[in-house]
Amino acid sequence: MSGRGGRPDWAIWIVWLALLAGVALASRPALPLDETRYLSVAWEMWLRGDFLVPFKNGEPYSHKPPLLFWLIHAGWWVAGVSDWWPRLISPLLALAGTWMTWRLARRLWPASTETAHLAPLVLLSSLLWLLYAQALFFDVLIAICALVGLTAVVEAALTGRRGWWVVFGLGVGLGVLAKGPAILVHLLPAALLAPWWLRHARRPFTWSGWYGGVGLGLLLGVAIALAWAIPAGLSGGEEYRNAIFWGQTADRMVQSFAHRRPAWWYLAALPLFLFPWLLWPRLLGQLGRTLRTEWRDLGLRFALVWFLGGLIIFSAISGKQPHYLLPELPAAALLLGHALARHPARSRPWLPALALIALGLGMSYAALAMGDTKGILGVIAGLPAWSGVGFVVAGLLALSKPGHPPRLAWAGLLALAWLLIAVLRPLAPAYDVAPMAGEIAKYQAQGRPVANEGKYHAQYQFAGRLRQPLEALHAPRLADWLESHPDGVAVVYLRREEDPMPYQALFSHAYRGGTSLLIDRRGAAALRGQAPAPVEEGED
């Protein structure tokens, strides 16, 4: 959203993201396993005074580079260790990404202030962007790095100034420090396919100079990454060194089977990622019309290469997660925003509005009419009867004025805010690790050792401000550990809350649909009869 005079409308953007961040902070804790893990890694680095090698539960943590952790530390240095600062990082980055999308729209379509008005609006209200703008993940950060690099590509194309390749290299280097070599998937299609998207534009450079600039930027990016990776590899040991130099490239990009999905999965998920916009048939028609009538347009071609390049490459990789495609959302916002600007809608967005209304009515009906039900329907049935009201209001808001995209955008924001307030907040106690973490901290303060059943994702380290790692052992070995540590305690898990409790627990708390329990050596006998705990989700 930008002022009609072509200036960015900071006030509206800030209010938009402040509302989202405030609702998220008030409605839910940091969620296990990912958010709590990243907080714990930052906490352990802080405790150790080691800002070179990330650590998780006492061991070097090779799954993620350190840039997000450094941003967490920067806030802690200024305001002290807190829970709230890390959770403001993504909203602040999303604000920066909104401005960068506005700036790209102004540069690609300088005569169309309406495109710069609408593209940030589409981005800010798309479901996937909203979800991760309030979550402590790496993907809004890598989206910012991609926007830095792609802004440099556009400026180099329009001005011919070689200095922009230094900025491109900065985007590459920071992207590697944010999430590894995946940044190249977001940057290289547009950089390498410039002869196609610049085919009908004036070029103030030679192609040899262009590709020389791309190579220079890549070398600079590699140098920035190696400035961290080499000393970190030397400090973290051989296993860590091998992991960051090899595991972050071949294994995580090509041989990732943890989230294996079919090649068409992203294409099928796009209407959800870009909800509510891709459920508006008239907008899709406008996009097709714009592509047909302006096929030679530099901006459209650039955004298409950016979006389709990432979509095709990530579709070909076995491991797929929704947030992998987040850096391509600004490209989609540019395409949809320009289509709305060139061919303004005159109809109401019936399909996304009816989807919201149906969701709200269905949730309220389930809460009123369904009894003792298992699974996700049981979760919905346990919500208050008014839990669907916000979705109905959001749908009616979208219909309130024909051909008015801001109403649809505000409906999208309202729907997500209501999801956090009405749905996630009642479920929050089952995802709050602080009570168990506090109990663990009490035992550690007494000098008593603590173990965890199964794979440990460090979910308690930051929440309890723990200063010692936990032993991670499966049930049979954990029983032996309790016998050999008579003053020790262990965290064990029941997969469902209704499961019978075979232990005499010192403390118990709801945990992700089941129960976490703190036991001592009296529970060792019960542990010996247990199957090994299921392995929880791995790294993404």
Task: Give the residues covered by each predicted segment.
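Membrane-integral, polyisoprenol-dependent glycosyltransferases
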Residues: M1-R348, R512-T515
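Membrane-embedded architecture of ER/inner-membrane glycosylation machinery
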Residues: S2-G3, V166, L170, L284-D540
